[in-house]
Amino acid sequence: WVIKPFWSPIIDTVNTKRSWIIGMQLLIGCCLALIGLTIPLESFFKYTLVFFWLIAFSSATQDIAADGLYLLSLSSHDQAWYIGIRNTFYRLAIITGQGLIIIIVGYLTDLTGQIYLAWSLLFFSLSVTLFISAFYHYKVLPKTEQKRSNNSSQLFQEFYLILKSFFLKPSISISTVSY
């Protein structure tokens, strides 16, 4: 999430935001499934660490693409409604991530008698949820934008201009250092 200001120009210039959203959901789903597969291993920690890092990176990428897509696709009124819905689900995700997941794993542990199996089943279930979400978004997300040029010199120029405009904003150096 820290590198979003540097990563977002690439998302904006390479491929469509719709394809980034769907692709990142598929990648997160794959990572969750791989976490489920590696939990029973003795050296699960290093594998899950890599997959969680990929999930964090993919999540930030999807967030950038989703922000861009709703700005392109929705009217100002609909954008306000979308932000309200998005914030509601963000809060629900925090509650779910902090409590419901642990309750489910506890229930699965009681059911199976094996904590590793319970966590694996949970991550497989989350993976299926992301695959269903990706399929749903493939069907319903609007195709409102054109694919951008993959000309490397043009991409570099756009990236440079975006970064330059970011760092030329008033008080950006103070904000960056104090953060």
Regions found by a protein language model. Give the residues of each.
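Glycine-rich segments within core transmembrane alpha-helices of 12-TM secondary carriers
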Residues: 1-4, 80-106
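Central cavity-lining transmembrane alpha-helices of secondary-active solute carriers
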Residues: 1-13
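C-terminal ends and interior cores of transmembrane alpha-helices
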Residues: 9, 21-44
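A membrane-interface helix-boundary motif in multi-pass transporters
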Residues: 17-21, 105-128
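C-terminal membrane-cytosol helix-exit motif in multi-pass small-molecule transporters
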Residues: 127-147
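Juxtamembrane intracellular "pre-TM" segments in multi-pass secondary transporters
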Residues: 143-175
